[in-house]
């Protein structure tokens, strides 16, 4: 299943992708957020004939695939090729950082470069969308808490992040620095999570290529 949100900023509708047709899920859930994401949503949708759901205009803006996420955490320097190109030792422990949830935006929305920014940068990432609360979760049980995956473009202001003291969050959290989407792909549709190609283009020029097989912390 592929879940997404479409419409103007602040009035997005929950939707599901039916092949290439966007179907309205407003009759099923109010929004795609921490209150609706989970096994119950998947089980409910499985019982539906989604071809009978209203079709939405394919030209509608695609919003962030998750509304108001409660946390936005990242793992820094987690691709081996990225670490090596910077002549850095691959980390033995995960480098965990946070982005303010207010930086979340739609995948095609404009990114606003902050005033006085000198080193705005970008990285394509894959995100794990957590589907239920948990604590002290064992590695063997961890996958049971994953609802699905989505793409993230992790924007950073590198000077603020690296050249000034303090936590990374100040260089990671400017408004629009967290485009996510276009949709959440449920985990059952990903056959091999650690063999996915990813790429990023800037103004039509390919700037990044990689594969999830190069992830260090898995």
What do the PLM-derived regions correspond to, one by one?
Residues 1-94, 188-191, 206:
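N-terminal non-catalytic cap/leader segment that marks the start of a structured domain
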């Amino acid at each position: 299943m592929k879940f997404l949100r479409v419409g103007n900023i602040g009035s997005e509708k929950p939707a599901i992708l039916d092949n290439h047709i966007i179907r309205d899920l407003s009759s099923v859930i109010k929004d795609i957020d921490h209150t609706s994401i989970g096994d119950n949503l998947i089980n409910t949708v499985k019982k539906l004939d989604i071809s009978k759901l209203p079709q939405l205009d394919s030209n509608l803006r695609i919003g962030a695939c998750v509304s108001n996420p409660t946390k936005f955490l990242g793992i820094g320097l987690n691709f081996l090729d990225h670490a090596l190109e910077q002549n850095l030792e691959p980390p033995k422990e995960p480098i965990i950082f946070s982005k303010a949830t207010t930086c979340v935006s739609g995948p095609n929305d404009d990114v606003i470069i902050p005033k006085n920014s000198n080193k705005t940068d970008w990285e394509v990432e894959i995100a794990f969308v957590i589907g239920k609360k948990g604590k002290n979760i064992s590695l063997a049980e961890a996958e049971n808490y994953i609802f699905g995956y989505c793409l993230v473009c992790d924007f950073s202001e590198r000077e603020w992040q690296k050249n000034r003291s303090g936590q990374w969050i100040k260089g990671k959290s400017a408004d629009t620095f967290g485009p996510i989407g276009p949709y959440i792909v449920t985990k059952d549709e990903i056959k091999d999570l650690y063999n996915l190609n990813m790429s990023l283009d800037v103004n039509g020029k390919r700037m990044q290529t990689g594969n999830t097989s190069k992830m260090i912390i898995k």
